[in-house]
A protein has these predicted regions:
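Membrane-proximal intracellular helices of multi-pass ion channels
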Residues: 1-347
């Protein structure tokens, strides 16, 4: 989920809307369709098929992704996320004059404004665009490609703590809901709850580790006597690469959620994490979309590991391995092994 372009300067609005946003919808719908097809294979007994991919994809777009995206986009607009076809707006910075240092003992001098651009006033061009509509499906579809190069750290893409919360909830919504969908379709709700509980346990353990590591601060700075204790004047901890409006906790929570769901959205700089914090993020990425994972891909990724676990457990106790009434044989294990090893081999 590497974003190697600055959308606000590289892409036109029509490209963002008709190219990238459409692909965000189709990507998420494809994952949901594949997951639903796999669940049907577990649920059905005598049926000859497991459904039509195109029908499932259209249903996922029209009945799930589009309605949720509209609601989320409106909520984000209410928080200050921009939604306009205007390319940019010009603004005059607050600091038009700057002070310059002079030799010791002399008075401080004030320079005149820089080279005039508009009536002698410095002007800043602020990029705008249809941001809220793209951010909504970026988060709901666990895609990650932001309208701006700074992604969800940009103040026009994620301006407030509440918009940050909405974006995190959007990331977790579909992967969590699909666990309950699985339990409902196979006729055993506890099966879906079991998958959700397994995902949540791993997520919470790593979340606690990153919280502790980032709030403890950078040990190299501690040796230099830098004050990294939380107080009324600072959030404390390792604030390098993090937005002040979010602080440690909101940044870390977003970090863990976005890496768990295999989403490329970020609201802080992951390269600036402490060693333990970065280790947890890398571990979530390298799990291969198992802990919640992307829209649809997290569910079928976890089911692949469930099949393997059931097979090993069956061999250990001397019983024929079965999962939801379906026997797990050599062919199923070969296919599960290919699915597990595919991503590491490609990487």
């Amino acid at each position: 989920n590497w974003q190697a372009y600055a959308g606000e300067t590289t892409m036109a609005h029509i490209t963002q809307m008709m190219g990238l946003t459409v692909q965000n919808f189709l990507s998420a719908a494809t994952g949901v369709a594949v997951a639903v097809a796999l669940v049907r294979a577990f649920a059905r007994k005598l049926a000859k098929g497991i459904g039509n991919f195109w029908v499932d994809m259209v249903r996922a777009v029209l009945y799930v992704l589009l309605p949720l995206s509209v609601v989320l986009a409106l909520a984000l607009v209410s928080q200050g996320v921009v939604q306009t076809l205007s390319p940019q707006v010009q603004a005059a910075p607050v600091e038009q004059l700057k002070q310059v240092s002079t030799p010791v003992g002399s008075a401080t001098m004030v320079e005149a404004p820089a080279a005039p651009t508009t009536g002698g006033v410095r002007i800043q061009n602020i990029a705008l665009g249809p941001v809220a509509s793209q951010v909504a499906i970026k988060q709901l579809g666990t895609n990650g490609g932001g309208f701006f190069n700074a992604n969800s750290a940009h103040p026009l893409e994620n301006p407030t703590p509440f918009s940050n919360l909405l974006e995190m909830l959007a990331l977790m919504l579909i992967p969590t809901a699909l666990c309950f969908t699985f339990g409902c379709m196979v006729g055993e709700h506890r099966q879906g709850v079991a998958l959700l509980a397994a995902m949540s346990c791993v997520l919470l353990m790593l979340l606690a580790l990153v919280f502790w590591a980032e709030q403890s601060g950078n040990p190299l700075l501690a040796r230099l006597g830098v004050d990294m204790q939380a107080s009324a004047w600072q959030p404390g901890g390792n604030m390098e690469g993090k937005e002040l409006r979010f602080g440690i906790h909101a940044s870390v929570l977003f970090l863990v959620v976005t890496t768990a769901t295999a989403c490329g959205a970020v609201n802080s700089l992951h390269d600036s994490l402490t060693p333990l914090g970065g280790m947890a993020a890398l571990w979530l990425i390298q799990l291969g979309e198992v802990v919640f994972g992307g829209a649809g891909s997290g569910l079928y990724g976890m089911l692949v590991f469930a099949i393997l676990a059931v097979f090993v457990a069956g061999l250990m106790i001397g019983r024929t391995p079965e999962y939801l009434g379906k026997k797990i044989g050599a062919f199923e294990i070969k296919m599960a092994s290919i699915a597990i090893l595919a991503a590491p081999l490609v990487a």
